[in-house]
Every structure is written in C-alpha cells, then in structure tokens.
Amino acid sequence: MSDRYAGWIGQIYTRERYAARISRRTKKLRSGQFVEEVLPVESVAEYYTHFPVLEIDFTFYRSLLDRKGNPTQNYHVLRSYRQHMTEDDGVFLKVPQAVCARKVRKGGAYVPNPDYLDAGLYTDGFFAPACEILGEALHGLIFEQEYQRRDEQAPPEVMAEEWDRFFDNVPRDPRRHLEIRTGRLLSRALFDVLGKHGVGQVLSHWTWLPSLRTQWEKSGGGLPSGDGSQVVRLVTPRGKTYEETYTAAHPFDAMVEGMLHDGTVEETVEIIRGVVQRGSRLYLFINNRAGGNAPLIAQRIAREFMPETD
C-alpha cells in the first residue's frame, strides 16, 4: 500500500533515477525517531511497471477540498500523481478519516467526531474532486472505520443502520469497499447493508481483527463491491500494534524474520482462489509493516499461488 519508499530501490525503483532527489523526514514514535526516505512523485510511473493498481493512503488524513471548497495540499498532490500515470494505471483512494471515524484525536484525547458519516463532506470534499482528478483511473474507494473498544462500541445493528443512512445519502458507486476494524461489528446486519448498497467487504489482516479466513467465512465467502471486485489488505501481523510493526520493519528494505505470521500467505492464496473461482476480481494491497517489505511479500504470495512460475 502506498509507494515512494526508498527501501524499494533495487526492487521496484532504479537508484540512478532518484539518487539526488530523495527527500527525508523524521517520524517520532515512543520507541524512537526514524528517518524516512521518500522518492519524488514521478517515481509512480516506475511503480506501475510492476503493479497495475496503487492504493493511496494520504487522502485518509485530509480531504481534497476544505469546507469552503478550496483545494487542499492533497488535491494538488493527487493531481501530480495523475500527471505521471497512463490510461492503463489504476488507483484506490482511502476515504478521509474525518468521514469514517466515530472518534478523532484532539488535544491528546479521543473525542466524538462531529463530521462522522457527513454525506456532504464526503461527496463535496472528497468524492467529486477525486472523480474529477482521476476519471477512469479511479478503480476503488476504501472506507476504513477505526477499532472500537468493547465499552465504546455501538451495538452492531446501530452501526449498520448508521452506514445504511450514509450510503442512502451519497452518490451510488460500484467501486466502494468498507473495512471495519472491530471483529464484533462484522455482523449479518452490516453485511446486509453492504449488499444493499453494492459495497464490498474489505478482508483485512490487522492487529485486532480475526483471521482472514474467519472474516471470509463470517460473510459467507466475502462480499464483492458492485463492480464485482474483492479487496484484501495485509496491514500488520495480528496482535501487533502500529508502533511495534513500524519499529521492526523500518527502513522497509527487507523481510524481517518471524514477522510475517505463519499461514498468512496460505490464507491469502486460499481467498484469492475462492474469489477467482466465483469469477470476481481481487485487489491485494500489502503494507511493509505486514512483514518488512511489501514487494517481497507479494512475491511470496505469487509463488504460492502459481508455484510453476518460480
């Protein structure tokens, strides 16, 4: 997921093309400070020589237009990406957290989000400008709702009703997918809402979620979006936090021994085969934090899926 990692030089990117144009920024975590090396936006053209679709994550943190309709920095960055893409290249965008999150961090605490499932913020501030910028290159939209502790969770039926009302009030689109990061909320009520609106179920290998196989079985074999596609995301090993996995995986240039959980590759391939058998398209997005280096994880999955090509 995402791109422009200097750790992928020699795998995805050619060193000579970017050597003098790698930017650096410092990321601060409780475990320490980490220097991130980032390639220029134009490197996306080389990314697409290896993979047909890119998941862009930065739209999760800020919308494309502000409340007054003015373009944000993300609007301009996304336009820059589009300039380096061909007509065959595709993009998945993450819907802004401001739309999907029940709570947001403010002043060191998590407080109720006043913009939660705001149809206008989504439609005017994100969806419309995304379609304007990307056109046919927009292959999918991922809504991600944060993990909710048991004492803060709404009943599954209430949460399903909230999403039902939201989807009733935004433009219908067959490219939408929803990732719910609370296992208890993966309910029949939710799956019925997704089916009603043609929204796909994201199968996510993430910290506090049950296994991919369990998520797949809960919905009766996954739920594709209206265009018939299924999304699988390998984000972190189960039971491991963002900080733990980031610290272990940085600088994302190699696999980390023991980090990729046993069975993850096999479960992923099992789901790929199930989706293919029903005649659907599967999009697989892999985070470096799932095992150290996303391209090498993708290679392992490809070899498991088609061993004769190794």
Positions of predicted regions on the chain:
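Residues lining hydrophobic/aromatic ligand-binding pockets adjacent to catalytic sites
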Residues: 1-310
